[in-house]
Amino acid sequence: MTSHSVDAPGRLLTLGRVDRVRVQVGFRAGPDDRPDQQFLLDVSVPGADRDPEDAFDEQQALAVLEPVLRAGTGAPRHYSLHLHRWHTSWGLNPNALDLGLLVTTGARSSAADAQASHDSVTRAFRDLMRLTGPPRPAPTSRDAAILRARRAAATAYRVDPDAMSLSAEEHHPADNAWTLRMRTTAGDAYEVVVGVVDGYAGSVRVRHEERIEVADSIGAE
């Protein structure tokens, strides 16, 4: 008979240490609006032998992300935040921390504001990667970049990745980054940059582009 008991001398119910961190930061004009752009980071946290006192937790992530609220302005913006921790006692899956931050920028945000938001997030992601341990640099292939782009757009905007097609691409070898334009069957377009932070493929920016309606005037007289 197979035993399913837990062999643990200490406290049984625990969230465990964080093995993986997934962060999503988006910017939107108003609380009910679709985000104009979203940034995603997916990093592993190495070091199974790390001292429990030095273990990575959500408070560290929140402290690193806090400057994003003030990007481009002196006053902090309104935001919504969700946080999820996932842990299995049998260890078959990584203990994950999922964190989502949506910042309300206001309807009058300019191109300069958007750039300030971009810069603040890339700085925060870079700091997060320093805390978790910098990932090893590795070239990102075209196929891997397309897969990342599909998944990122699907995660950021809740679209079916199989309903998206690649309409344009640009490789930036010096930065180990790819800029890919994905289009859905419904006509929505997304510009996705894979490797937005120092060429790390797990850092992605997704920007939703305004849908352009094309009127067919042939035969209309």
Residue ranges and their predicted role:
Residues 31-35, 88-92, 169-176:
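Short, ordered beta-strand-loop transition motifs
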Residues 163-221:
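C-terminal assembly and membrane-engagement modules of membrane-active proteins
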Residues 1-88:
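Membrane-active, amphipathic/fusogenic segments and juxtamembrane/transmembrane anchors
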